[in-house]
Amino acid sequence: MIMRMTLTLFVLVVMTAASASGDALTEAKRVPYCGQTGAECYSWCKEQHLIRCCDFVKYVGMNPPADKCR
């Protein structure tokens, strides 16, 4: 009984952590337009106060600005 409850709690914690780490990518799926270029998309991402904007720009299929992303 305790083993089952522990396993359930563990699964809930892992699922919560995984969903929190993907916030920027989830936002990318919701937003259909963020600019014509990678630099515009990066600026839009920063205006939205999102984190991991370089990954966000790559995820939507653009090249992030070289001076901001490595």
Swiss-Prot record:
Tissue: Expressed by the venom duct.
Gene3D superfamilies: 1.10.10.2920
Range of residues in the leader sequence: 1-22
Keyword Translocase annotated: no
Keywords associated with the record: Cleavage on pair of basic residues, Disulfide bond, Neurotoxin, Secreted, Signal, Toxin
Propeptide: 23-30
MF annotations from Gene Ontology: toxin activity
Disulfide bonds: 34-41, 45-53, 54-69
Chief place of localization: secreted
Keyword match Secreted: yes
Transmembrane segments: none
Cellular location(s): Secreted
CC per GO annotation: extracellular region
Domain of life: Eukaryota
Function (record text): Probable neurotoxin.
Family: Belongs to the conotoxin K superfamily.
Domain observations: The cysteine framework is XXIII (C-C-C-CC-C).
Name of the protein described by the UniProt record: Conotoxin Im23.4
